[in-house]
Curated annotation (Swiss-Prot):
Name of the coding gene: CTB6
Induction: Expression is positively regulated by the cercosporin cluster-specific transcription factor CTB8. Expression is also affected by nitrogen and carbon sources and pH, and is also controlled by another transcription activator, CRG1, previously shown to regulate cercosporin production and resistance.
A Pfam family of this chain: Epimerase
Species annotation: Cercospora nicotianae (Barn spot disease fungus)
Top-level division of the source organism's lineage: Eukaryota
Pathways involved: Mycotoxin biosynthesis
Residues of the signal peptide: none
Intrachain disulfide bonds: none
Residues that, per the record, bind NADP(+): 172
Summary of the knockout phenotype: Abolishes the production of cercosporin but accumulates the naphthoquinones called cercoquinone A and cercoquinone B. Leads to dark orange-red mycelia with significant export of colored compounds into the agar.
Descriptive protein name: Ketoreductase CTB6
Amino acid sequence: MADSLVLLTGATGFIGFRILVELLRQGYSVRAVIRSAAKGQWLESRLTAVMKGSDYKDRFQTTIVADFVTDGAFDQAAENTSYIIHVASPIVSSDNPDDWEHDFKRVAVKGSIGVLEAAKRSGTVRRVVITSSMVGLFSPKALFAEPSEVPLNAESRIPEMEPPYAHKMLAYQAGKIASINSAEAWIKHEKPAFDLIHMHPSFVTGRDDLATTREDLRKFSSNWHSMQIVLGHKNPIGKPILTCHNDDVARCHVSALDPKVAGNQSFLISCSPEDGSEWDNVKKIVQREFPEAVAQGVLPNDGHMPTVNKGVRFDVRKTEETFGFKHIPYEAQVLDVVKQYLELPEKDEGVEISTTA
């Protein structure tokens, strides 16, 4: 492990940064892909704050790849690496549906195939791990509408979705589906010396060590699914309560580098919702654990988001048995995020609210 260099994309994001920290703590050397020198400086500052003097600096480096879809974009970055973990997703700012086929789908496929081609050209890469999503495996109907006759598992594959897309989430899903299908087809056709593993997390929740203020945590991420309720927002659009802790996501990605884990397979990452689970149950948890913050109005705790398809079920036994852990339950996920929110200052303020948990 000590001489194993991992190329990591997406290190400046919520999931990727947690994977970066876990890699360094496990003794790996990491070359993080960044899009600009400024991003690299910011990443190093956050890493210094989180690692708190740990002996890691001689095992961490950055490399700039400004455009992920350029031919050969990752070739130089992948040189002399043993593993690649590709977490980065397309950055999409357009609200024009005419742009989404390119921005979500084609860019996602180009990025994944570009990573695989760079791994092949390197001659040193032994395994590539790609971060996908649960939406890359299952249809919208299976996730949002139909109770599971049998628990859904990571062996599922579905045909690609074609435009037009009714909303951004469908375009995002189309990109994830196309990416995994294209990557697996590439592996089958090229038969490279390395293998491929896909990770499929559900809605990722947990402490975000890139956040330095409460305002950061109020910006949209998958943590927002729960925090919007805690902070008093009322969202009419429902979602299934399928979540996983960021620590578990990082654990699975890093553990997947172990050669004892067979390659060319997928893993579903999600805790199992208990019967009767609803997003709005977060209000009971917060009232019980943080009564002072609720009384002060720091946590309004009166929001709402509908829970849809309470009958959906996942089979994550393969994930837990392969990597030797049990998924962190939803309540612990929520507590980690709310505790962090209360610990952090508001923007440009230094006031912290005491907690009871």
